[in-house]
């Protein structure tokens, strides 16, 4: 299953988790210090909340979660054929998860887009990969 990811900066993680739990009638899939994510079934959405006081209400980054690394590679190849520049990351730790991914470069409005798959849980927020720059504080 593929689904859209929306990563939001929030001022108050606890209040935001309470709000989105009610809005989507689901509990978060993962909660860590300064970080939470929801696997919303309907509509299919990965909602990520990153506590960044003073930046609440803004988009942190956007993404598409895909089922496996083969799909990450297929999407990266498709975008390369369409002329998109990408930055590949494999086996990185990002947002408390091990991931294979790539980032789309040079978006027209400067937003950060990733296509990724989750390989498993990770005890750390990030490992110095690009995720740490984009999601600083996740």
Where are these regions (language model features)?
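N-terminal beta-strand motif that seeds the catalytic metal site of vicinal oxygen chelate
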Residues: 1-14, 44, 61-62, 124-138
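Core segments of cupin and vicinal oxygen chelate
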Residues: 2-46
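Vicinal oxygen chelate
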Residues: 3-11, 39, 54-138
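Structural preference for long, well-ordered alpha-helical segments within the folded cores
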Residues: 18-19, 78, 109
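Short linear motifs in intrinsically disordered
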Residues: 25-30, 67, 90-94
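Conserved beta-strand in the GNAT
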Residues: 46-50, 114-116
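A short, sequence-level motif marking secondary-structure junctions
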Residues: 51-55, 120-121
């Amino acid at each position: 299953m593929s689904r859209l990811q929306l990563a939001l900066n929030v001022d108050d993680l606890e209040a935001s988790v309470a709000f989105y739990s009610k809005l989507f009638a689901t509990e978060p899939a993962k909660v860590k210090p300064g970080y939470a994510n929801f696997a919303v079934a309907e509509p299919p959405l990965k909602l990520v909340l990153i506590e960044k006081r003073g930046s609440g209400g803004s988009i942190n980054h956007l993404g598409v979660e895909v089922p496996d690394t083969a799909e990450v590679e297929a999407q990266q190849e498709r975008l390369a054929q369409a002329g998109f520049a990408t930055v590949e990351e494999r086996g990185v730790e990002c947002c408390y998860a091990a991931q294979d991914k790539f980032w789309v470069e040079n978006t027209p409005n400067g937003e950060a887009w990733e296509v990724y798959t989750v390989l498993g849980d990770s005890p750390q927020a990030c490992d110095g990969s690009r995720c740490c720059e984009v999601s600083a504080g996740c």
